[in-house]
From Swiss-Prot:
Subcellular localization: Cell membrane
Similarity comment text for this entry: Belongs to the ABC transporter superfamily. Phosphate importer (TC 3.A.1.7) family.
Complex formation: The complex is composed of two ATP-binding proteins (PstB), two transmembrane proteins (PstC and PstA) and a solute-binding protein (PstS).
Species this chain originates from: Bifidobacterium longum (strain NCC 2705)
Matches recorded under CDD domains: ABC_PstB_phosphate_transporter
Keywords associated with the record: ATP-binding, Cell membrane, Membrane, Nucleotide-binding, Phosphate transport, Translocase, Transport
InterPro entries: AAA+_ATPase, ABC_transporter-like_ATP-bd, ABC_transporter-like_CS, P-loop_NTPase, PstB-like
Record-linked Gene3D superfamilies: P-loop containing nucleotide triphosphate hydrolases
Amino acids binding ATP: 37-44
Highest taxon of the lineage: Bacteria
UniProt name for this protein: Phosphate import ATP-binding protein PstB
Keyword Transport among UniProt keywords: yes
Source lineage: Bacteria, Bacillati, Actinomycetota, Actinomycetes, Bifidobacteriales
Length: 259
């Protein structure tokens, strides 16, 4: 089952530069939460702090708390690698490992975490993860073919299978459909709706229609001016956000008057 995330007074820095300030948000388990907002407002930056992925950038650091079921992911005794096992990430562009087969792509995260599996267990895990990503029937007869040979939409679902194979509690998705055609986009959206019964899902999207279709809750990020830190402007259930937002800036953004 998915787990709850609570972000309390989060400030995100790159060196001395304050990129995002004072984010407070409660992300419900087994729901889809969408992050929307204009370019540069910090939504992807906040997303990457939820699994400490931003730390690959030298000088990046966080003030405040990011709690997963009450445990602060930034406590000194917390291993970032362990965080990324519990919180999976699917990136903007499909990124299957180009030298690996479909099968090996699914198992890559498991083996990276030094888990040795018997062949029968590995086969079962590959089938389970690919079924979970709605890809099994399309690839079951060519598991040893290169993952890079799949279509764009299939590659993205393969990346989702790779993410779920390590049994995370949360799935983060950074514009997962931006490089896909409309048919592949709908396939991924259908998959997201199915996955939320097992995972907490947070998705960054520039597509307002997509957020309205798939999200249970929506967070609108904004920035006051170029060079100023981004911030969480407004958070609401998605029906309220798109039909009756109680925030003028959110209403202007959703209606296309800026952004």
């Amino acid at each position: 089952m998915g787990q709850r995330i609570d972000v309390n007074h989060e400030n995100i820095y790159y060196g001395d530069f304050l990129a995002v300030e004072d984010v407070n948000i409660n992300i419900e388990p087994n729901k889809v939460t969408a992050f929307i907002g204009p370019s540069g407002c910090g939504k992807s930056t906040v997303l990457r702090t939820l699994d400490r992925m931003h730390e690959i950038i030298p000088g990046a650091h966080v003030e405040g708390e990011v709690l997963l079921e009450g445990k602060n992911l930034y406590d000194k005794d917390v291993d970032p690698v362990a965080v990324r096992r519990d919180v999976g990430m699917v990136f903007q562009r499909p990124n299957p490992f180009p030298t690996m087969s479909i099968r090996e792509n699914v198992l890559a995260g498991v083996r990276l975490n030094n888990h040795h599996l018997a062949k029968s267990d590995a086969d079962d895990l590959v089938e389970w993860a690919l079924r979970g990503a709605n890809l099994w029937e399309e690839v079951k007869d060519r598991l040893d073919n290169p993952g890079i040979g799949l279509s764009g939409g299939q590659q993205q679902r393969l990346c989702i299978a790779r993410a779920v194979a390590v049994h995370p509690q949360v799935l983060l998705m950074d514009e997962p459909c931006s490089a896909l055609d409309p048919i592949s986009t709908l396939a991924v959206e259908d998959l997201i709706n199915e996955l939320k019964s097992d995972y907490t899902i947070v998705i960054v999207t520039h597509n307002m229609q997509q957020a309205a279709r798939i999200a249970d809750y929506t967070a609108f990020f904004n920035l006051k001016a170029v060079g100023q830190p981004g911030h969480l402007e407004y958070f609401a259930d998605t029906i309220t956000m798109f039909n009756n937002p109680q925030n003028e800036e959110a209403e202007r953004y959703i209606s296309g008057r800026f952004g």
